[in-house]
Amino acid sequence: MTEPQSQAPLDADPEGYAPSVARRLAFYQRAGGIVTPIMTAVVAFLMGGIVVLSTGHNPWRTYKAIFEGSGLNWFFHVGSHSIHVPFTGTHVWFWWDTNTNHTAAYNLTQTLLTTTPLILTGLAVAFAFRCGLFNIGGQGQYLMGTIVGVYIGSRFTDMAHLPHVLFALTCAALAGALWGAIAGFLKATVGAHEVITTIMLNWIALWIGSYLFGRDGPLQNHFNKAVPISDDIAENAKLPTLWGNPHLQALHVGIFIAVGGLIAFYLILNRTTLGYEVRAVGFNPEAARYGGISVARNFILAMAISGLFAGLAGGIDILGWQFRLGVLDVQVSNIGFIGIAVALLGRNTAVGVGLAALLFGGLLTGTSTRSLDPEVFPPQLAGNLALMIQALVLLFVGADVLVLTIWSSRKKIGLGRRNAPPAPEGAAT
């Protein structure tokens, strides 16, 4: 009896084996230390600086303005300040000025608000990667979380504050999980590629939101039928704020939920049986199947958990600062797509995703028109710079996949190894 052939290892000669893009990327991300992502970010910013220079502006001044616009310079403003102790009337000494009238403090608040959903959408992509799946559907899962979150948040107005918040967040997370599980189920049962199905689900989620909150839609605002927007969520469904003016997008407790997501991501993958099975399937699904692990079950669970992270991000944004959802919000949002760059730059690890999310959060806030001096860098170029750096990160991280594809396809285009010429007659063998 011959043993079933298992899939070749990911670092094997690719001449006879070409793993999926997702599995190859996941393997690449696990290999090596922190040097590669750091170099990826540095090179991306250097090339961005070349573009800035080509427009006639000073790259150093531009990046300095972006850094200050992100509010991260707040940590350098050390002095003698005080901070209010919650639930008391006392103040204690603190290193930094927490008054959000201070420009750096306000900008930092905006950076952290942007970082919060990026952490969760980054985890949504990273968790699927660890199972060898490429979750392009973080955007659709995020949108489903926002749709369900705004619906629950604007209803059940008689509920107490904490139960209402927990109920809305739970429903938003479950909506994202269901949306992700659909792609996982199709992958597990009929072999439908998750990239195709998640892209399709992104569009379905977008048009569901556009219909529900559009003109004469079933969930359009009851008091203003001229505006394609949802009802505002109830006051008792809003997340508690930690820092800043609640009417000016104050920092809310969602940042702690996102950090909790990072911890949960690490514990699930490294301290549970489920995590072991997910990683085993990600390394080699055939070997995992031979070892008694249900590959189909893990495909579904991995995509469901990925969707849960993204749906939770949508619920947090709605309950934390957005408070309503319009057709324009649905159609222009790209938080889920940025999560792909966050996961790749963070090498699909909890710490890496957290740091990458902070980097992109600061970049997006720092390049916003409210943060940049037009004389330093024109607003019309600022947003494009942020998009270009995201694209460069994806390009550099995925470059090895291109090399692998060319290498494994060289025979098809006539570039394979040439057979050795036959030995002359009478030659020694």
Where are these regions (language model features)?
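Cytosolic-side transmembrane-helix boundaries in multi-pass membrane proteins
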Residues: 1-43, 49-60, 283, 290-298, ...
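Short loop segments and helix-boundary regions at transmembrane helix junctions
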Residues: 25-35, 55, 128-138, 159-233, ...
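Hydrophobic core segments of alpha-helical transmembrane domains in multi-pass membrane transport
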Residues: 36-53, 118-125, 146, 150-152, ...
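Single transmembrane alpha-helix segments in multi-pass membrane proteins
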Residues: 50-57, 61, 65, 72-156, ...
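Transmembrane helix-bundle core of multi-pass membrane transporters
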Residues: 69-72, 78-85, 198, 202-271, ...
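Cytoplasmic juxtamembrane regions at transmembrane-helix boundaries
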Residues: 126-146, 269, 274-277, 372-376, ...
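Helix-loop-helix "hairpin" substructures at the membrane interface of multi-pass membrane proteins
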Residues: 178, 246-325, 350-351, 355, ...
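Transmembrane alpha-helical segments in multi-pass inner-membrane proteins
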Residues: 307-310, 316-391
